[in-house]
Amino acid sequence: PVRSPQWGYRRKARLGVKYVDKKGGVIMGFRERAKPYITDCHQCDVLDERVSALLDTLRGTFNQLSVAARIPQLEIAITDNRVAMVIRHLDSFSDSDLDGLQRLAQAAEFDFYLQSGGLDTVVPLTGNAQPLNYDIAGVTLKFEPFDFTQVNQVVNEKMVARAIELLAP
């Protein structure tokens, strides 16, 4: 069987974001299956620790945005050397909002992207967003933060290595 670490393995995630006044502001986490609820997460042990450790910081920053109630989701893509987050927003950010997001991106060393509509509207928050890529079986794969990639890189690497082994003459 192919196995991976139990914790910190998840390299791709889509978190729901919702402003709930009765809960004191923004909640963030995975959507409950077949329900309109979000499981409010302050940490997520299956996510890469670089992201899990900053969920409350993200929440705090989002709570201070003028459009906090208009952010429905956060798409996360993680590689060995980069973390990219696509912030889906339904209303435009103010200049103050953009400054706050830039400060967080610099402090966390993350790349933020903004998405106001479909995939064709995704733009980097700043002009210096680094490309995402990972190496597998000697091939470097480049991708965008919203592209499909395997959630569990360790399992993916093991499966590819096993497939190559089985296909060898």
Give names to the regions the model predicted:
Residues 1-169:
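Accessory RNA-recognition modules of RNA-modification enzymes
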